[in-house]
Amino acid sequence: MIAYASSLDQAGPICHNAEDAGLLYSFMLGFDPKDSTSIASEKYSFALENNQHASKFEKLTIGLPKLGFQERETDTALIEIQKVLEGLGHKFVEIELPNIDASISSYYVIASAEASTNLSRYDGVRFGYRCEAPKNLQDLYVRTRSEGFGEEVKRRILTGTYALSVGYFDQYYLKALKIRRLI
């Protein structure tokens, strides 16, 4: 797993069934002293003992944004999930997301800025791809990153570096963080 945009990243395991997802979740859960994004909390414990089922969990009220999805398959899947969860006693309420129009540009600035920092370690010395037969250290860095990253990744790294640079940090990155908080 590679960190792309730490404040936005979320591990999303793909499993055959809910029990496998619960088991994997129990391994991922909890405090890791080597992970600055983890927390130690009893609140988020997950028990698999005694074949616990979803119907026994606390009933939730789930906010569903008034957005509509572009793809019919997404809408159909969401409606099916909503029916199942309502059948288990959970409640859905329609919600408004303020400033949603600014979310894509805010995401792009934050993700690119964090990616430029997170991906800087992939220089061929300790992490990631390494070019063959570099002439010197500068050649190692340039060729490793040129050959190892695709065009879109390079574009995002450059965009993020620009957003974090002196003179543009407040104008782009801090503004994007404020927009994210408003949403």
What are these regions (language model features)?
Residues 15, 72, 106, 131, ...:
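Charge-dense, low-complexity intrinsically disordered segments
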Residues 1-77, 81, 139, 143:
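A short helix-breaking turn/cap at a secondary-structure junction
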Residues 45-46, 72-97, 123, 127-129, ...:
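Acyltransferase
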Residues 4-10, 33-35, 40-42, 100-106, ...:
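Glycine-rich, flexible loop/turn motifs
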Residues 36-43, 60-61, 65-67, 95-108, ...:
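Flexible, acidic loop-helix segments that line cofactor/substrate-binding pockets
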Residues 74-76, 104-113:
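Short glycine/threonine-rich loop-to-helix capping motif typified by GTGT followed
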Residues 56-65, 113-182:
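Short helix-loop capping/hinge segments that flank enzyme active sites or metal/cofactor-binding pockets
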